[in-house]
A protein has these predicted regions:
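Post-signal peptide N-terminal segment of secreted/secretory-pathway proteins
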Residues: 67-142
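Loop/turn elements at helix/coil->beta-strand transitions in domains of secreted/extracellular proteins
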Residues: 38-40, 102-106, 146-152, 311
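Short loop/turn segments at strand-loop or loop-helix junctions that form parts
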Residues: 43-45, 104-121, 154-156, 315-323
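Generic extreme N-terminal start-of-chain segments
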Residues: 19-50, 54-76, 90-93, 179-240, ...
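A glycine-rich, often tryptophan-bearing local segment used as a flexible ligand/cofactor-contacting loop or short
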Residues: 120-128, 132-248, 252-253
Length: 377
């Protein structure tokens, strides 16, 4: 008996049609939407030998949201060269700030990707660019901020502040101070991959004994070499660190979920608790809390801060904007929302924090910046 394949063929054609329409319509929608004009200056002051730039995720989002420079030029990331290029020599990526920051809506202080102990070597060989923000840079940033330019700073950018004078200039803009400490969840404190040799040496030098820790914990390191370990089951009930938005932060961002965070974060001290939009939740025991007090470490770990006093600024204390692959889907309308929905809230998922935290947070920041009209003389 001859089999009839017509129903199967029709079903396959119907599926292909639905898929094609589902991809083509959002692409046409993206192509037809009017671009958003924003001039964004990305300041990359990391050492030239640092890992790939952390602003790749920002550039993907700018492209996906169809945000372009006011000249009409779009932001383009060249993945092959691992650097950011803009068309026709109109680059807004800079290591040296101009004498006057004009025609700018947003200054973005970028930090480079790092999976190890946060450290930036600010010493350079003769003839090389000086890594780190100088007093000159800080003065120009503060001058621009006083004229209404918003400032966004990423995790680890404070390690690029080369002097106390730089800190003094940027402190009123960001509305926070650095404690000098950084923290990270460690799943195996005996692992030489997760706990570097430098951390072990610093601990042994100060404590006068071999590295004694095992199991899970939270590692805290100071820029001067100090090391504190919060042991899972003793200093913290569980070693997990969860990012949780405050009530103000939930209203601001629309994010209701909590997310387990496993990368490095800055421990900062805000001028006002009202500036905290999200914080890291830890299950500190009384013993762990006392250990932090003895070390002079704040027990509250802010994650995202927004300063809207005399200056408009935002600080992300974690590396949320890291993007592993620069996706083609940036030209699909709504792809950012789809990825936020379909990406599981699991720490093992690559780019989870990018889609579920960084993208919605940066979209809200860009929306606020867009609402502010700058008229330059």
């Amino acid at each position: 008996m001859k089999r009839n394949h017509r129903p199967l063929t029709l079903w396959l054609l119907a599926c292909l049609t639905v898929i094609s329409v589902g991809l083509v319509v959002p692409w046409i929608w993206w192509q037809s939407q009017a671009p958003v004009l924003l001039n964004i200056m990305i300041i990359d002051k990391t050492n030239a030998n640092a890992p790939y730039p952390g602003y790749k995720g920002l550039v993907w989002l700018l492209n996906q949201q169809k945000i372009v420079q006011k000249t009409g030029e779009r932001y383009v990331y060249d993945e092959n060269e691992e650097e950011l290029n803009l068309l026709e020599n109109t680059s807004t990526i800079t290591k040296k700030l101009p004498d006057e920051v004009t025609e700018t809506d947003l200054i973005y202080l970028a930090s480079s990707k790092t999976n190890t102990v946060p450290a930036v070597n600010l010493k350079t060989k003769k003839g090389e660019e000086i890594a780190g923000l100088t007093v000159y840079d800080a003065l120009k940033i503060r001058e621009a901020a006083s004229r209404g330019v918003a400032v966004v700073a990423e995790y680890n950018t404070q390690s690029l502040w080369t002097s106390d004078n730089v800190r003094d200039q940027l402190h009123p803009i960001l509305g926070l101070k650095s404690s000098g400490w950084r923290g990270k969840y460690i799943s195996n404190l005996q692992s030489r991959v997760q706990v570097s040799e430098q951390v072990r040496m610093d601990y042994e030098r100060i404590a006068g004994q071999a590295w004694p820790y095992s199991g899970k914990g939270i590692l805290l390191v100071h820029e001067d070499g100090g090391v504190i370990v919060l042991r899972g089951g003793k200093d913290v009930q569980t070693a997990e660190i969860k990012l949780s938005f405050t009530e103000k932060g939930r209203q601001w961002s629309g994010i209701q979920q909590e997310f387990q965070y496993t990368s490095w974060f800055d421990v900062v001290v805000p001028d006002s608790p009202e500036s905290i939009l999200a914080r890291y939740k830890t299950s500190l025991t009384q013993e762990g809390r006392q250990k932090l007090i003895n070390a002079g470490i704040p027990g509250d770990f802010p994650a995202i801060l927004r300063n809207d006093g005399d200056y408009q600024s935002y600080y992300m204390t974690g590396s949320y904007g890291e993007m592993e692959h620069y996706s083609f889907w940036r030209r699909i309308k709504g792809w950012d929302i789809i990825r936020e929905w379909i990406t599981p809230n699991l720490k093992e998922i690559p780019d989870m924090f990018y889609w579920k935290v960084y993208v919605p947070v940066m979209k809200q920041i860009l929306k606020e910046v867009q609402a502010e009209e700058h008229v330059w003389p």
